Swiss-Prot record:
Residues 154-184 form a coiled coil. A motif (COPII vesicle coat-binding) lies at residues 228-229. Belongs to the EMP24/GP25L family. Keywords: Acetylation, Coiled coil, Endoplasmic reticulum, Glycoprotein, Golgi apparatus, Membrane, Protein transport, Signal, Transmembrane, Transmembrane helix, Transport. Residues 223-235 are cytoplasmic. It comes from the Eukaryota. It holds the Pfam family EMP24_GP25L. This is Transmembrane emp24 domain-containing protein 9. N-linked glycosylated containing high mannose. Residues 47-145 form the GOLD domain. Appears to be involved in vesicular protein trafficking, mainly in the early secretory pathway. In COPI vesicle-mediated retrograde transport involved in the coatomer recruitment to membranes of the early secretory pathway. Increases coatomer-dependent activity of ARFGAP2. Thought to play a crucial role in the specific retention of p24 complexes in cis-Golgi membranes; specifically contributes to the coupled localization of TMED2 and TMED10 in the cis-Golgi network. The gene is TMED9.
Length: 235
């Protein structure tokens, strides 16, 4: 089963109050759905990778559990404790920020330090166990980004917060996450602008180079034809 996650970005006209309001509303709606729950199948030596766009200084929590296909029952059963998953996370600069072996069910966490596309890869350690024996493994994965990664029930119990205090804390963290998302969108716009300017500059220089090459070829052809006609005494 192939699963593709995407985000639709609507860009209002800049410089208008309505555009700023719409952008804020879109960010709020997007933040409300930043949890990504899915499942996928992997083979014995297969690796699955996912791309998640994450702002900087944002916590990400991934929960997973594995199921092994039982050929006799023809259904997926909970995997044995000996079957583990290796999780590797790379930042947009391709630096490894997490690489660790986990069990058949577990949780991994990391905090982004660079905004952009983070690569999350999982594969099993099944080559060490004959119980897998070329079968298929089903992995249920749930990724929570930003304030959605917080367990507010646990926070309230730990810090002894009232319902009002907890709600205020949730709102504060939501506002902070919105600010991070806005900063990330501005960073993306700046990168896009730089890429566009660089591309336009290259196109301009390539056009100038093509023009110079054509002029040089034209001059060379005229001189060559003149020499040819003079050699044939036609001029």
């Amino acid at each position: 089963m192939a699963v593709e996650l995407g985000v639709l970005l609507v860009r209002p006209r800049p410089g208008t109050g309505l555009g700023r309001v719409m952008r804020t509303l879109l960010l709020v709606l997007w933040l409300a759905t930043r949890g990504s729950a899915l499942y996928f199948h992997i083979g014995e030596t297969e690796k699955k990778c996912f791309i998640e766009e994450i702002p900087d200084e944002t916590m990400v929590i991934g929960n997973y559990r594995t199921q092994l296909y039982d050929k006799q029952r023809e259904e997926y059963q909970p995997a044995t404790p000996g079957l583990g998953m290796f999780v590797e996370v790379k930042d947009p600069e391709d630096k490894v920020i997490l690489a660790r072996q986990y069990g058949s069910e577990g949780r991994f966490t990391f905090t982004s330090h660079t905004p952009g596309e983070h690569q999350i890869c999982l594969h099993s350690n099944s080559t060490k166990f004959s119980l897998f024996a070329g079968g298929m493994l089903r992995v249920h994965l749930d990724i929570q980004v930003g304030e959605h990664a917080n367990d507010y029930a646990e926070i309230a119990a730990k810090d002894k917060l009232s319902e009002l205090q907890l709600r205020v804390r949730q709102l504060v963290e939501q506002v902070e996450q919105i600010q991070k998302e806005q900063n990330y969108q501005r960073w993306r716009e700046e990168r896009f602008r730089q890429t566009s300017e660089s591309t336009n500059q290259r196109v301009l220089w390539w056009s100038i180079l093509q023009t110079l090459i054509l002029v040089a070829i034209g001059v060379w052809q005229m001189r060559h034809l003149k020499s040819f006609f003079e050699a044939k005494k036609l001029v």
